[in-house]
Amino acid sequence: QRFFQAVLTDGQPIVAAVKLSQQGQFNLNEMEDKWNKFTATQLVTTQRLGFDWDARIQMTPGLNAFVHDTYLLGEGSLHASLLGLFTVAKLQGAPENNQGELLRFLAEATWYPTALLPSQGVHWEAIDDTCARATLTDGATTVSLIFQCNAEGAIATCRAEARYRDKVAAMPWCGRVWEYSVRNGMLIPLEGEVGWEY
């Protein structure tokens, strides 16, 4: 309740679609900090849950990896290629992939916070004064995240007990957002980071 009062205005229209531009750094290496610059555009729909993320990750000067990550009609899909020609990863439709992509949608909903309203299918369960568990079901997939709010009532962190990195191992996954600013009448974070806990 406190979160919605902090980030939404009275009468805030429900966000139906969003287009985002992103830039940042991406670490593809599990063993060491090896950060690569990326740029991306992302389209999100909230009435039929989904997103389409198109990213370009600079591996070395002149060598880019292209990553297309989607959640559409209840199915997660990831395709990564070098130079847009050579496929290096392809995942589609496995329950583990669907779970991971729906978790991503739920975590990123801080950018389109009306999607977190109970009227939009999110079930909230208070844990304490600053934390609550949000659960979202889409078709056969159900996911939960624990969100923690800052002193102002806006979301500061989220955490999933288990998100699949691949079809074998699920590990704790967490995110942090900050630098809140008003956009289209909503208070949303402009910066964030996510990753698996080792």
Give residue spans per PLM region.
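Gly/Pro-enriched, hydrophobic low-complexity segments
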Residues: 133-198
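Short, solvent-exposed secondary-structure boundary motifs
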Residues: 26-38, 53-62, 107-119, 134-140, ...
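N-terminal mature ectodomain segment of secretory-pathway/periplasmic proteins
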Residues: 5-86
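Short, hydrophobic/aromatic-rich segments at coil-to-beta transitions
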Residues: 14-21, 46-54, 127-135, 156-157, ...
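A short, polar/proline- and glycine-enriched secondary-structure boundary/capping micro-motif
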Residues: 61-68, 87-92, 144-146, 166-171
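Flexible, processing/modification-adjacent segments and terminal tails
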Residues: 79-138, 168
